[in-house]
Amino acid sequence: VIKRKIPEKYFSKLFLCNKFMAFVNKAKPNTFSHTKGEHPRLIIPFYDINDKVFAFQGRAFGKEQPKYLTVKLDENKQKVYGLDTVNLQEHIHIVEGPIDSMFLNNCLAAAGADLTLKVEPSNVTYIFDNEPRNKEIIKRMYDVIEKDYNVVIWPDNLQLKDVNDMIMSGMSKA
């Protein structure tokens, strides 16, 4: 958490889980058929607008794959982080991962979901990861541009992958 320079105001919403798969199986029985290869993960809870946890993400600390595992406790809700803090009346930023969202004001993380919001597209800016050769990201960029949303286009010379990498490299918020 400290290495990634996560703002202190989020520390109380993040948790260490030494046995992630066992934790998941308690929260959502039979998610994992076994717990071989058990390892610790950072737990990032997803809260809805009523401050109720409806999903959580486990982020690996090492090279374990997948790096992110998101578990939905309510299958009817979109995998969106930040619903408990976003103000839909103000300009909204949408990034891919919860950690990236912690560095931007009024920000949501789509966490792999195709996010649908009932807000004016001109009031939203999508900030996809800087992966110009990733066909899935390029397709999603085109999709949101066609719907008249704002999209950040990274300069060709930027070698950093996402907002958190930029913060860790010494860049600051604008």
Predicted regions and their residues:
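Replication-associated primase and helicase/ATPase modules
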Residues: V1-K5, K9, F20, N25-S33, ...
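A generic short-segment signal for beta-strand/edge and adjacent turn/coil regions
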Residues: K3-K13, F61-Q65, G97
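Short, well-structured beta-strand/strand-turn elements
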Residues: R4-L16, C107-L117
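Generic, ordered loop/turn and secondary-structure boundary motif
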Residues: S12-C17, D100, N164
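Phosphate-handling DNA/RNA-contact segment within nucleic-acid enzymes
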Residues: M21-N123, I137-I138
